[in-house]
Amino acid sequence: MHSYYKFGYSFLLASLVGCAAIVVNPQARKVIVSPNHAPKGCLYIDQVVGNQGNFFVGGYTSNAHLEEGAMNDLRNKANALGANYVQLISNRAGITGSMGGSYDNGVGGSSTQTNVTNVGNAYHCPPKLIGLSPSA
């Protein structure tokens, strides 16, 4: 019986951790994300996707945390590739819904934002060109 409590407690903690925004790595804080094209002189690296949330924990995560986490995930992935500039191509919020009926045969339901996905093109730019100090 004691192991059931441990399992339940562990599951609860894991679920709550899923409600927090993905943390941005210290170096990734310097990655600039903009809808503007990369300046001339920047080198294209790859496309990156940042995501936060899913159908299970997304409904328990605030929209602000979903948005912040997806942006942090994008920055972390771009930084891991050596990029310091991301041209944001798309930003989408995923909605999960349900349909239900009522006692009078009416149709009802609900929907909630459960994830956010950002897609962008990652570039490495001369730091001075994008407003970063040369040591960045």
Predicted regions and their residues:
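Sec-dependent bacterial lipoprotein signal peptides
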Residues: M1-C19
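Post-signal peptide N-terminal segment of mature Sec-exported envelope proteins
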Residues: R29-N51
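Bacterial Sec signal peptide processing site at the extreme N-terminus
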Residues: L16-P35
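Surface-exposed short loop/turn segments
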Residues: N25, G53-H65, M71-N72, N76, ...
